[in-house]
Amino acid sequence: MCDLVARTGRLQQRYEDGSRLVAGCIPFRYVNSDKDGNSESGKVIQVLMISSSSGPGLLFPKGGWENDETVREAAAREAVEEAGVRGILMDFLGNYEFKSKSHQDEFSPEGLCKAAMYALYVKEELATWPEHETRTRKWLTIEEAVESCRHPWMKDALVEGFCKWHKEKMVKGEEITGEH
């Protein structure tokens, strides 16, 4: 049984200029690049994607940013609720705009959304999480994730946001700490 409960409803949602504000993350980890586990060969980065609750394709965890939390808190919460992972929320990757047919409401009749995306270094995978009965999670290489992205804006967040950030910050040896 899962002690965590996913937030639901739109009463506490944030809106700005007719767009629903969303927070999300691209969870990542490093694995050995060879089958034998020989660390001398280096590490490969993998990103975690989740199944959609409304159709085919894979997604990164994201959801509404609510009035009682910061955008970083919302991104971390969505990672736990939708993907069942916790870790170190790293840098801001960018804002990505998209339209959502399922999130049209009185505050955003056109379904416009603006997602603030972050990198999340995964430290813990939970056995159960709030949406574990409706979502599956899958670790993928960057190339596999690009091919699997359900939404073009998420592909942009991965390629233009995450990959550029990783190359600039992580490949140059920045330490992973909780001080971001």
From Swiss-Prot:
Tissue/organ expression: Expressed in roots, leaves, stems and inflorescences.
Pfam family, one: NUDIX
GO MF term set: metal ion binding; pyrophosphatase activity
UniProtKB keywords: Hydrolase, Magnesium, Manganese, Metal-binding, Mitochondrion, Transit peptide
Recorded superkingdom: Eukaryota
UniProt-annotated binding residues for Mn(2+) 1: 63, 82
Positions contributing to Mn(2+) 2 binding: 78
Residues involved in Mn(2+) 4 binding: 144
Keyword Transit peptide: yes
Keyword Nucleotide-binding: no
Residues covered by the Nudix hydrolase domain: 18-162
Main localisation: mitochondrion
Transmembrane feature ranges: none
Binding site for Mn(2+) 3: 78, 82, 144
Requisite cofactors: Mg(2+); Mn(2+)
EC number: 3.6.1.-
Motif (Nudix box): 63-84
GO cellular component, one term: mitochondrion
Enzyme class, broadest EC rank: hydrolase
Gene3D superfamilies for the chain: Nucleoside Triphosphate Pyrophosphohydrolase
Signal sequence range: none
Localization in the cell: Mitochondrion
Residue sites binding substrate per the record: 60
Similarity remark: Belongs to the Nudix hydrolase family.
Function (record text): Probably mediates the hydrolysis of some nucleoside diphosphate derivatives.
Protein name per UniProt: Nudix hydrolase 16, mitochondrial
Organism expressing this protein natively: Arabidopsis thaliana
